[in-house]
């Protein structure tokens, strides 16, 4: 129990410390999105960002202990359904230490998009994640177009507009 309570604090401290130490290396809008290859959470196989080149991709980092993730995951389901045929995809990257925690969360908040798992934390390190949830909207050329930190219901309309604009390019 204590371990579960301390884990988010330790992760957040580490992320903030690494951010402080590497401000010059921060991933910014306009940068090429860092590549990743991660195991799928619910099925066999891997998810690689390069497989989605040519699509607009929303890479969303989440965890079962993240309150705003309870709002964002269902909204992302809706956005994916709305824009998928136009070339939009969502990739969710779970950062829970225990797979069961993520699976229990997805039973309560099911998603219809690919979900990967990164227990080692190498991908959030590459993206210099500062908090949860954080997402990166990536254009068809693989460049970061938007960094979306946190989530509230009122974000869904502006996010939808941003996705629609990118899909037209």
Enumerate the predicted regions with their spans.
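N-proximal helix/coil linker or "cap" segments that precede and/or mark the start of modular domains
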Residues: 15, 19-35
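Conserved redox-active cysteine motifs that mediate thiol-disulfide chemistry
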Residues: 61-78
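Thiol-based oxidoreductase modules, predominantly thioredoxin-like and allied folds used
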Residues: 87-99, 111-120
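Thiol-/selenol-based redox modules, centered on thioredoxin-like
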Residues: 137-169
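Bacterial N-terminal signal peptides that target proteins for export
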Residues: 1-10
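Short, internal strand/loop/helix patches
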Residues: 103-141
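A short beta-strand-turn-helix
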Residues: 36-57
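Short pre-active-site segment immediately N-terminal to redox-active cysteine/selenocysteine motifs
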Residues: 55-57, 61-65, 131
